[in-house]
From Swiss-Prot:
Keywords linked to the UniProt accession: Cytoplasm, Queuosine biosynthesis, S-adenosyl-L-methionine, Transferase
An annotated Gene Ontology molecular function: S-adenosylmethionine:tRNA ribosyltransferase-isomerase activity
UniProt subunit comment: Monomer.
Biological function: Transfers and isomerizes the ribose moiety from AdoMet to the 7-aminomethyl group of 7-deazaguanine (preQ1-tRNA) to give epoxyqueuosine (oQ-tRNA).
One GO cellular component term: cytoplasm
Name this polypeptide is given: S-adenosylmethionine:tRNA ribosyltransferase-isomerase
InterPro entries: QueA (IPR003699), QueA_dom1 (IPR042118), QueA_dom2 (IPR042119), QueA_sf (IPR036100)
Amino acid sequence: MKKSDFHYDLPDELIAQAPLAERAASRLLVVPPSPQALADRQVRDLPELLQPGDLLIFNDTRVIPARLFGQKASGGRVEILIERLLGERQARVQIGASKSPKAGSLIALDAGGQAEVLGRDGEFYLLRFEIPTPLEHWLLEAGRLPLPPYIRREPGVEDRERYQTVFAREVGAVAAPTAGLHFDEPLLARLRERGVEFGHVTLHVGAGTFQPVRVDKLDQHVMHKEWLNVGAALVEQVRRTRARGGRVIAVGTTVVRSLESAWRKTEAAPEGELQPFAGETQIFILPGYRIRSVDAMVTNFHLPESTLMMMVSAFAGRERIFAAYHHAIAQRYRFFSYGDAMLLWGRESGLGNGES
């Protein structure tokens, strides 16, 4: 299987550069199992598309203002993108500079203080910050929001709110779990009234999510690592949902990545079952992999040749995904982080468009 198998052509004007005025006003392409017809809806229609007893699972990670700028002793400019916080004053980072900084070198930060390069960590660097407060708190004032590279503008005040989900609470992501951006408090209230239950996982989306696949043969691709937590309470929620015949719907690919990373085969469950898990994942989901943990997912439209295109193709089938994407392009849907969404049912769900 090749990277080019997941290419499609997208007009630049369909890449959303800013959010809509209302989160739930985004369009929603409902993609039931083939051969049922696609349906053009809105995210605010979700209460009509889900049933009492269904379980929506969100990623509650919170985006940190993870982009910093500074200057090396030589005078060269440096851009720092924090990948992961490591204690109060250390972090794993990406560094953009004309020359790679050496261990022991210092970077004077534009926001004040300095950072010492401790060394390399694979494709990343380890930095120790000399700043007055713990890094997590200092970044709230000193850092800049790391909007994705395809958003061709500087982040504004509005992005501090809109590039964050309304249920974000666990600090640590450098990119938003974008499917969750469509949910506002009125929509959540209507879903509760409908009898839909909510659960949460945490997956801290890392800077690796912006990295392209650099090899054409996918069996040579090395997936980036991300930290996640699937708690015992969520596992019990899923068990109860299954027991009563409800459906499990992931809000975003990060939730699917979390649940599949916590899926374990046991003697009692040879096909596997969800179990509590906290730690790093490097799971790479592409066609040939069977996603067992969810019946459906709400997800945005993904970049050509990305690992997320591969994941949704594994879930719904490559031909079905490409038919949906071609429909979305023809109907002028908005793409990527600030764009529209899909309600995607798995090939094996047999659940139609979810309407009751």
